[in-house]
Amino acid sequence: MERLYILNPYDSNHINLLMSYEQEHKVSTKSLESIMKVRDSLTEEEYKQLKKNANEIELSIFTEESGKIKDLCFIQGENDIRTCKLFFSPTPEKVRTRKLLNLATDFALNTLGMQSVFVVTTANDKTMHINLENCGYENLGEEKGSIIYLKEREVEKVQHKHQ
């Protein structure tokens, strides 16, 4: 059964899963770089306190199945402007649907309270483009070989009835 986790920099199992993922897929992720920086500079208590009060958001979520990370997303954003970017790890196999895209988008909009979620992907990653568009992202165009996508929180429209 596939499960969703928030990557905990102080959970040795999470770190081992992430290191195994990087080795298996021969990739370097923002997630490992970020948590190692946290572990080297803050105690767990300092980290928890900082997270409560920080304007900046830097965290990773991942799906795990059968003791391995299946997919990984690094989230970087700012609480005051309620905007974030999602960075997905490259997956070597051709994934037709990327379940973590929906989960990460919902997490950013509903759990973190973001208004705008951006994803930047390479121009040649057609599968990711299809997944983003199927998830309701708007293609904002190409910049320096990358395609920028945006999904905004749907604001409930208040209709005024004239009586």
Predicted regions, residues:
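Conserved acetyl-CoA-binding loop-helix of GNAT-fold acetyltransferases
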Residues: E93-N110, I130, N134
